[in-house]
Amino acid sequence: MSIQVFCDFDGTITNNDNIMSIMEKFAPPEAEEVKNKILSQELSIQEGVSQLFQLIPTNLHDDIIQFLIETAEIRSGFHEFIQFVKENNISFYVISGGMDFFVYPLLQGIIPKEQIYCNETDFSAEFITVKWPHSCDDHCQIHCGLCKSSLIRKLSDTDDFHIVIGDSITDLQAAKQADKVFARDFLITKCEENHIAYTPFETFQDVQAELKLLLEVKA
């Protein structure tokens, strides 16, 4: 058995949800209704996020990148946490419903690209199109977009100890199959609604301290 950590990006590794930041800055007002339908689960994540990015003109690509470089902040303790998992031979993956054009640049030099799973984007037309290379497998039929529970099944064995770190509705299906969940923000609400045990966190120092205790118990 090995310990596998599966970590969300937007609102988890970063302090803010970058997709929502992009929408607030660059999308027209109708994006708000789509966002609310995603959170209420009236729209699947795949449908909703596709609709959101179809509201953004592709000629804003450079402006969006510059905006995120200037505003995105990595959550406190993340760099030290990555060093901690390396030192303890813990497998670490970023499984993000975010987009390649901002996830890769913001994690460059911190996480190897082969440990990052995210969505792809096409800027060749008038509006941004999202591609979904990590869709649901046969065990999930809810149109996640990037299916985190499917990736967990793909990247690990059933007897591994699965840790999920997340903050929102997009992390719920992964949390359902995790052995331990670190949650903040809206994921806490969804965990409580679904009777999923979780440990709340605000910084990666919190996560590291709890994981250190877990390693001592399992030693």
Swiss-Prot record:
Transmembrane segments: none annotated. Pathway: Amino-acid biosynthesis; L-methionine biosynthesis via salvage pathway; L-methionine from S-methyl-5-thio-alpha-D-ribose 1-phosphate: step 4/6. It is an enzyme of class 3 (hydrolase). It catalyses: 2-hydroxy-5-methylsulfanyl-3-oxopent-1-enyl phosphate + H2O = 1,2-dihydroxy-5-(methylsulfanyl)pent-1-en-3-one + phosphate. Keywords: Amino-acid biosynthesis, Hydrolase, Methionine biosynthesis. Pfam families: HAD (PF12710). GO terms for cellular component: cytoplasm. Belongs to the HAD-like hydrolase superfamily. MtnX family. This is 2-hydroxy-3-keto-5-methylthiopentenyl-1-phosphate phosphatase.
